[in-house]
Amino acid sequence: MATQGDFRARFAAALNEAKGKADTLEVQLGGEVLGKILKTDVKTQAEIKSAVNGAAFEADIKSFLNEIGIPGDDNIETGFQLLRQSTKPEQMLGYLNSRTLLPKDLSGNDPISLTQDLLALPANVAKKLFIWSWKSTPSTGRGEVWLSLMLKDGKRPDSTQKGDMMIDKAEWEVKGDGARIAGQKGFGDAKQMRHHLNTAIVKFCGDIGRKAPDFLDGSAADNAWNIGKKSAGLLGKSLEALAKEKKFTKKDLDKLNTYLVEAYSKYLLNFTTKLSLTKGVVGLDGKINIAKYNRILLEMYYTHYENTEEFKGIFLVSYTNANKVLACTTTKEFLSAVDSGKIKIAAYPSFTDAAGAQGGSFAIQLV
């Protein structure tokens, strides 16, 4: 005969079972119950929904990634695993199949927020998509894949194309934080610039009937000819020493510019310019306005880079302190962004023994 304790135990078990049913959700696949999860387990529910959505749209997502030139099954799988986490897959695929985002639309907009709005991706996944890259030769930098995926007519370049990404068959360059204004061609050996600048001063002195300073004996430190944010290096030291003996004339400074441009053309291969590194920059007393000198030199470098690479435009991508993207389609737009403080010089040209071809150029990044 059942005791009072037996009834109490059965009643408690029945209550627990009822409570369990109320607190859980069944997970079914094709009518088969695979198990249960707690109603409060929002994370697992989201993962299951993502898996179901991903499975339903896997072919479409992977087909899109293949069409825009994502190389290799591993990379396509990585892209799929990111995109499958969209909370609105129909909206995401609708956008990817009819992309509308233009380069000009990126200025002032947070790329993570744009990705969330257009693809309905969680913020953490949108960030992963923004910085998604892989090892390759030449390297695939952060932001390049995101731009190829999000922009109207965006694609990855094929083996016959030299841009970092393509928009409607036009080549675009992408520069991340601290990237150098230099490409794969058109630049000489930065280490030799010490010799070229030294030679420029010697030739200049000979042209104006002056004796070159005694300290130009080749024994200086390898960074002596570097011109940074505050120091004009041996160039500034040489000019001030010469002007101390006898001030320059405007004609002298015009000749100096000729020799300086000639020196830089040894690094910026086949470079010609009408810009002057001395007019309004170097005083008759030999003092260099370093800010003006670097601003003109930056314009020379960028113009050479643009003409050599023949790209449609350049994207600057920032992902360290803040997520930003800026598009520039002309030298004027780039320099305007520099002058307005949107772009800053992250590093100045270095001509040391450790400098490679790109080390002799300016490094830039968004502010």
Predicted regions and their residues:
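Short, positively charged
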Residues: 24, 28-162, 170, 174-367
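Intrinsic-disorder/low-complexity linker and hinge segments
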Residues: 17-19
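Short linear clamp-binding motif
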Residues: 3-15
